[in-house]
Amino acid sequence: HLAPWDPTRSEEFFTEAGQLARTRELLALHALDTAVPLVIVDGDEIAGGLDLSNIVRGAFQSAMVGYWLDRGHTGRGLASVALTALLEACRDDFGLHRVQAATLLANHASQSVLTRAGFERIGVAPDYLKIAGRWQDHVLFQRILHD
């Protein structure tokens, strides 16, 4: 169910070895303070993922956020709860000032998650990301964490 919203992935990505390589890459980025990879849990199940990426320090103090949920865990507010908790950590623990997100124009569910978490729409970026095999426009959102 994520294929319309995700980059085209190699078959290797969906293997145990591919996921191990991805996990190692994410942990290496975390060690460099440029990413915070997280999982969303529902009881004892992994329900999805939440990634803070492209963390930039200095005068910018900003990052990108992305998230996904397994089909069986959508529509119950899990993404909103997880995103809200991450935003609190971004402000209180990581010292970030701003978090940005991008969604495909037709991804209204994700846009609702962002709006509920206090993000504001800041514009549309043409040909922003290569999703499902083609460059596609995205709606950009931001959340300013400090007054």
Can you say where each PLM-predicted feature lies in the sequence?
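GNAT-family acyltransferases
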Residues: H1-G72, W135-Q136, L140-D147
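Conserved G/P- and acidic residue-centered "switch" motifs that form tight phosphate/ATP-binding loops
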Residues: D44, G77, N107, G133
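A contiguous pocket-lining binding segment that forms or flanks enzyme active sites
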Residues: L83, G95-A102
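Hydrophobic pocket-lining residues that define ligand/cofactor binding sites across diverse proteins
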Residues: C90-F94
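Conserved catalytic-core motifs of GNAT/GCN5-like acyltransferases
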Residues: Q100-A102, E120-D137
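Conserved active-site tyrosine of GNAT-family acetyltransferases
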Residues: L114, F119, F141
